[in-house]
């Protein structure tokens, strides 16, 4: 990864995101500047700048039928978590519909859950919350994103218990 800085101290990544020419795609091993980039992305999106204004960049709804053309690509998806669940192997699922076999789902593997806890996000308490997630959309009993770091999940509107006490 190359980090280029302009004369005013703004990084190239910040400039591209702020002008709506790029969306944030954070990775678990590279999250130091994600919060700032997400702020800039939201400002560009709300102002309809660059690709946001052209609708080349969009925040998709969690509708599985609408997501079908976007399988096998990185996308941003927003919706209400209808329920949460856990598998025997410790995976946590965030379900965006009543049928996990076809609806959009987010999964977090057991090995990554401590990162969410450390960030103050109680995944099991997200039922009813509206969240925005970003990542690779795969087909696994409907469209699914596997999150490995909390910076890829934004709480848009969360019920009070969605955050761990004291955070």
Whereabouts are the PLM-identified features?
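Small beta-barrel nucleic-acid-binding modules, primarily SNase/OB-fold domains
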Residues: 1-167
């Amino acid at each position: 990864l190359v980090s280029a800085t302009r004369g005013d101290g703004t990084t190239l990544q910040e400039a591209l995101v702020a002008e709506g020419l790029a969306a944030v795609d954070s990775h678990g091993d590279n999250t130091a500047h994600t919060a700032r980039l997400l702020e800039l992305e939201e400002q560009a999106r709300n102002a309809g700048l660059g690709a946001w204004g052209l609708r080349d960049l969009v925040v998709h709804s969690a509708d599985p039928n609408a997501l079908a053309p976007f399988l096998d690509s990185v996308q941003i998806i927003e919706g209400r978590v209808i329920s949460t669940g856990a598998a025997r192997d410790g995976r946590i699922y965030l379900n965006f519909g009543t049928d996990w076999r076809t609806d959009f789902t987010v999964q977090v593997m057991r090995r990554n859950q401590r990162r969410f806890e450390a960030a103050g996000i109680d995944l099991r308490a997200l039922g009813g919350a509206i969240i925005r997630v970003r990542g690779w959309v795969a087909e696994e009993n409907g469209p699914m994103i596997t999150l490995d770091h909390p910076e890829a999940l934004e709480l848009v509107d969360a019920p009070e218990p969605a955050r761990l006490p004291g955070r």
